[in-house]
Design a protein with these regions (language model features):
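Short, flexible helix-loop junctions that flank or precede catalytic/ligand sites
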Residues: 2-3, 20-29, 37-453
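Long, low-complexity intrinsically disordered linkers/tails
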Residues: 13, 17-19
């Protein structure tokens, strides 16, 4: 089903009366009868909100945005794109234009355009510029009016290896050793919106699964994309319980239990039994601000089995996404000896650091006499100074000294972090400084990430 023609139409005009060229956009709607979908598409092409509706999405893809957020109010609507984790506001829309484009998307997805309060969800697949995309739509009422969120994802993952994520070889070697071990628990974690699902998938796909049997137990309603060579088993309401599924899986004698969540005390106790008696292994994940927070959450969330879980913990991976400097326009500068000392870098070891090229705002693009001057904008990053993201990783190895520290300082996480740093653990600051020294990112961006922004 092709949505939009490149030929100009007198119906496709902007508010200023100029003709709008609407890009081709193939749309395949999920959960809508094919004949019904065709009828909806034909009808929507005649609506005034069709051009801005299509351009909203195609411009987002061209901009590399992975989210589109629209907030409606009585006066109008404000749309924002999220590019490399940073929200960028678009010019404000009048209410009529915003309502018109929203009607189009709700009609396309088989939703109710008149419903502005209850949550509505839809999904469609599209091919744009020879790339397959899956785009989710959600609208819901909020006190100020209505909020709409588009989530844009590639159908086929681009990131496939730990190197693609930005993980150093030494960290990869340690992590793979943990994942390929036995008689223990490995935790993969990250703050919300910092790429945990992607790292979870890639870490598991890069573990050795050819000589060992890996199984994943998950709630069916939370089902995620398949992970290569990991056999999935699901529990669900109205079907087999988690305990019933685990009992069936245990009979198959897998080597590694993959648990996106620890589910409950019965499952935790059962897996711990397999680890101690059968030398099995477990990998789990959790949303957490850092490695210390991740393990503390797991221990406090399972008080009955906290001691046993701490006893089998082998390592905790945590990550934060950070923007990469644009290779086409980044600027080198010579750091002062004082700055190098502050960063913990030996004098003379790093001759150059890099910073982004950010053009001045339009009102400052004038000469000494106030005449406007032309400022060249980087065509690759469009003046953002950054292009794409990588991850900074901290991998906390849990040995007997660490277990003792967690047991004693679990209620004093800041003191625990201080102990871990004194023990030589390389955290986000150290990893970030190394990334800056390699010219991958800037000190300004590192500071933003360390402040949790």
């Amino acid at each position: 089903m092709i949505f939009g023609k490149k030929k100009k139409s007198t119906d496709n005009k902007s508010s200023a009366g100029t003709e709008i060229e609407v890009p081709n956009l193939e749309i395949k709607v999920s959960g809508v009868n094919k004949d019904e979908a065709v009828g909806l598409l034909i009808a929507c092409r005649q609506l005034p909100g069709y051009p801005p509706a299509i351009l909203l999405v195609t411009n987002a893809i061209n901009t590399r945005a992975d989210r589109i957020l629209i907030d409606f109010s009585a006066q109008g609507a404000v749309a924002r794109y999220r590019v490399d984790g940073i929200w960028e506001s678009l010019p404000a829309m009048d209410r009529a234009t915003a309502d018109a484009l929203l009607v189009v998307w709700k009609k396309i997805l088989g939703l109710n355009p008149a419903e502005r309060k209850a949550r509505q969800d839809g999904k469609f697949a599209t091919n744009f510029r020879d790339i397959d995309w899956v785009i989710s739509f959600m609208s819901t009422g909020v006190p100020s009016g209505e909020r709409v969120l588009f989530t844009i994802e590639r159908k086929k993952p681009v990131l496939k290896t730990l190197t693609d994520l930005g993980m150093r070889d030494a960290v990869q070697e340690t992590l793979k050793g943990m994942l390929n071990g036995d008689k223990g628990m490995v935790v993969i974690s990250a703050p919300a919106t910092h790429g945990l699902p992607t790292t979870w998938r890639i870490a598991l796909e890069n573990a050795d699964k050819f000589v060992r049997d890996w199984v994943l137990i998950e709630n069916k309603k939370n089902q995620e994309p398949d992970i290569i060579n990991v056999t999935e088993y699901f529990y669900e309401d109205g079907g087999d319980s988690a305990e019933q599924v685990f009992d069936k899986v245990r009979l198959k004698q897998p080597d590694v239990y993959v648990l996106p969540s620890l589910i409950g005390p019965q499952i935790v106790e059962a897996v711990l039994g397999q680890i101690h008696k059968e030398h099995k292994h477990m990998v789990t994940r959790i949303v957490a601000s850092d490695a210390v927070d991740a393990l503390i959450q797991i221990l406090k969330g399972n008080p009955k089995h906290a001691k046993a879980l701490l006893g089998v913990a082998q390592g905790v991976l945590n990550q934060r996404l950070i923007r990469r400097l644009c290779e086409s326009c980044k600027q080198a500068y010579q750091p002062t000896p004082q700055l190098l000392q502050k960063l913990g870098l030996p004098a003379g070891r790093v001759p150059k650091l890099y910073k982004p090229t950010i053009p001045p705002p339009p009102e400052q693009r004038v000469d000494a006499k106030g005449n406007p001057i032309e400022i060249e904008i980087c065509k690759k990053c469009n003046g953002r100074g950054y292009f794409g993201r990588m991850a900074l990783f901290e991998l906390l190895v849990i040995d007997d000294n660490m277990r003792k520290a967690f047991a004693q300082l679990i209620e004093k996480p800041d003191e625990l972090r201080k102990f871990i740093k004194q023990a030589g653990h390389s955290g986000f600051f150290e990893e970030g400084v190394l990334a800056c020294a390699l010219g991958q990112t800037s000190l300004e961006e590192l500071q933003r990430i360390l402040q949790g922004k």
